[in-house]
Amino acid sequence: MPRSFLVKKIKADGFQCSGVSAPTYHPLETAYVLPGTRGPPGDNGYVAHCLPPSGYDGEQKPGLELAPAEPAYPAAASEEYSDPESPQSSLSARYFRGEAAVTDSYSMDAFFISDGRSRRRRAGAGGDAAGAGDAGGGGGGGGGGERAGRSGATAGGGHRHACAECGKTYATSSNLSRHKQTHRSLDSQLARKCPTCGKAYVSMPALAMHVLTHNLRHKCGVCGKAFSRPWLLQGHMRSHTGEKPFGCAHCGKAFADRSNLRAHMQTHSAFKHYRCRQCDKSFALKSYLHKHCEAACVKAAEPPPSAGPAS
């Protein structure tokens, strides 16, 4: 007998080892989307996002049913994450539940994670301030004690910067140094001169404002007067239009310039420090006192002209 009859023929389209059963393929009834995977481009040039059903036409046997992929994060309730800084805010929770689309807009605060340290720091600062307020307020209310503690730290605790020449005090050292410039002599080395006109200044802010007066770029179209700043020109234009947008809340008097309104508001103040020596009348502004002295008191103090003898 030839040796070829002793060898078992094996089909060319399959392979089977002894003791190992051949794998059975079953068609997928539905297409399952695998997150993060993309198939090869199709005929229309687009990438397929899902797996097509298998084309194997074999014997139908019950196979294992694939379970849908679970989300990477558990679905969060809207009330569970109420912090807008949390990465799992209400928008992200709705996205994982499938209620929100990818096109939902997110603010930048949604991408910052807060670990709570800043809140604890603010809470600790509030507690320290409340404790200081209770100590300074003598057992008063929480709000009043806190305000009392803050005012005591500013006024009572009291580090004020005093000028050695005139004794005037300031809250900050920068304000004091700016004030000390006014005590300089025009002949000192610290004085500066204007590069255009040569005028000397001991205060650097005053020199900076003076330099701007040589560059009058903003000119009035009505009278031709020029100004260094646009808001100065805007206030000047009100003198041509007669507009007075700044009104007094007490008497209703209107002004074209805000600074004039501030000066007028001093007349309604209860503090009137400038007193006339002749009639004992007090004024809130020194300029008003000068006008009063030049107009009323001076004329009242002058003796009436004596009548000449009748001829």
Curated annotation (Swiss-Prot):
The keyword Magnesium does not apply. Residues 124-146 have a biased composition (Gly residues). InterPro entries: Snail/Krueppel_Znf, Znf_C2H2_sf, Znf_C2H2_type. It is found in: Nucleus. One of its GO terms (cellular component) is nucleus. One of its GO terms (molecular function) is sequence-specific double-stranded DNA binding. Its main location: nucleus. A zinc finger (C2H2-type) spans 161-183, 192-214, 218-240, 246-268, 274-297. Residues 71-90, 120-156 are annotated as: Disordered. GO terms for biological process: negative regulation of transcription by RNA polymerase II; regulation of neuron migration. It holds the Pfam family zf-C2H2. Residues 1-20 are annotated as: SNAG domain. Keywords: DNA-binding, Metal-binding, Nucleus, Repeat, Transcription, Transcription regulation, Zinc, Zinc-finger. May be involved in transcriptional regulation. Belongs to the snail C2H2-type zinc-finger protein family. This is Transcriptional repressor scratch 2. It comes from Mus musculus (Mouse). The gene is Scrt2.
